[in-house]
């Protein structure tokens, strides 16, 4: 596998708003939300995918709690933050992401960053960067690598660390076994496949099986890089979704409640795509009359949510929210609110949709029709 820029290269360092002007896609650096199906809260990341987290109640729209910059487990249970108020020590805190309460706090000598976490939240990766080397800590195990490595993700048991190896001629993906300390190249299911692109968004399955990353190719085409976190084998899923870097970077990636389906929704490119994760192939493409690509808002990333039964998908763009019927492949007419949308989430009943606005009170829509409630 050659010339892949993985998702966590974009997420290792929290991006300030000024980074958006330097070419960071809205999905990685803009304000966006996630809402596990059936959850009572919506998570809004206000400074990129490793930025501060705000949790909102899906029934009232009220903010429940706020957490500092850190990493959130895919199942929505655990949040780990790191801060170095002193140059010589780092304070680390593990939170229950469902309540915002502290589970544990501790400190380490040196300056460490929390950069990855397993889907269950059981294990997390810490890195300490030096001029010539990078130190890793995962579940009590340590390793030291040249400074040309970045962390991409973790296997469910925390034994393997998936890495990006930077070279003068580009970069490749490798994996480190923390027990044997063996470093090997990440294998591709098709050895002859060559993928070139830049990561613009990613999502991990809540069962710890897949890390699914959307890549933008230099020619405007795109593909999904599906990394099996259990076996370490990578797969490529070619897409018919085409557009420039920022348009593709406004694609929302959402998983079905049973983790068997990945939905890609992009109102700027006018597409909703369905991928069967069992077959690793696109099974449906639906068109919609969406927004102009000239109006991509780099400060506001894409948000999406599914009802607990997986029937309705809500996705956003600027001030508009659309509802997609996953059973019939129908996109409902978009509903507009007064200001930019920063998050969406369905109530556990699946009958109402909470819409969070950047400037303004929360709105509630009927989950079937999109009408205001």
Give the location of each predicted region.
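Structural core positions within WD40/WD-like beta-propeller blades
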Residues: 41-43, 79-80, 125-126, 162, ...
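Short coil/turn segments that connect the beta-strands within blades of beta-propeller domains
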Residues: 38-40, 76-77, 122-123, 157-159, ...
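An edge-strand/N-cap motif at the start of beta-rich repeat modules
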Residues: 21-65, 72, 76-77
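Short loop/turn segments that connect beta-strands within beta-propeller blades
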Residues: 58-61, 96-100, 137-141, 177-181, ...
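Beta-propeller fold detector
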Residues: 64-69, 103-108, 142-149, 183-190, ...
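Bacterial N-terminal signal peptides
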Residues: 6-16
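Short glycine/acidic-enriched loop and turn motifs that connect beta-strands
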Residues: 47-50, 84-89, 130-133, 166-170, ...
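Repeated scaffold domains used in trafficking and secretory/extracellular systems
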Residues: 26-35, 66-77, 109-120, 147-157, ...
């Amino acid at each position: 596998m050659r010339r892949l820029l993985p998702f966590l290269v974009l997420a290792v360092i929290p991006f300030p708003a000024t980074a958006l002007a330097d070419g960071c896609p809205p999905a990685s650096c803009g304000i966006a939300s996630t809402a596990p199906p059936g959850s009572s809260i919506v998570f809004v990341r206000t400074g990129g995918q490793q930025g501060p987290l705000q949790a909102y109640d899906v029934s009232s729209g009220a903010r429940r709690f706020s957490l500092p910059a850190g990493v959130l487990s895919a199942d929505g249970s655990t949040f780990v933050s790191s801060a170095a108020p002193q140059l010589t020590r780092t304070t680390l805190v593990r939170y229950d992401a469902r309540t915002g309460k502290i589970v544990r706090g501790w400190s380490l000598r040196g300056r460490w960053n929390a950069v990855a976490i397993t889907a269950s939240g059981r294990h997390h990766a810490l890195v300490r960067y030096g001029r010539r080397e990078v130190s890793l800590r995962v579940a009590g195990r340590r390793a030291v690598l040249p400074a040309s490595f970045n962390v991409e993700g973790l296997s469910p048991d925390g034994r393997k660390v998936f890495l990006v190896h930077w070279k003068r001629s580009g970069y490749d993906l490798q994996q480190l076994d923390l027990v044997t300390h063996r470093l090997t190249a990440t294998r591709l299911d098709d050895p002859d496949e060559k993928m070139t692109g830049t990561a613009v968004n990613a999502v991990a399955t809540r069962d710890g099986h897949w890390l699914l990353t959307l890549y933008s190719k230099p020619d405007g085409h795109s593909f999904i890089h599906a990394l099996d976190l259990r076996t370490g084998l990578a797969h490529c899923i070619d897409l018919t979704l085409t557009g420039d870097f920022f348009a593709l970077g406004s694609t929302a990636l959402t998983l079905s409640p049973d983790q068997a389906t990945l939905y890609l929704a992009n109102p700027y490119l006018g597409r909703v795509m369905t991928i069967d994760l069992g077959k690793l192939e696109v099974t449906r493409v639906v068109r919609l009359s969406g927004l102009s690509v000239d109006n991509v808002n780099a400060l506001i990333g894409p948000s999406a949510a599914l009802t607990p039964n997986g029937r309705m998908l809500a996705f956003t763009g600027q001030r508009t929210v659309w509802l997609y019927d996953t059973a019939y492949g129908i996109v409902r007419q978009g509903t507009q609110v007064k200001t930019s949308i920063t998050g969406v989430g369905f109530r556990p009943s699946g009958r109402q949709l909470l819409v969070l606005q950047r400037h303004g009170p929360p709105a509630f829509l009927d989950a079937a029709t999109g009408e205001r409630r």
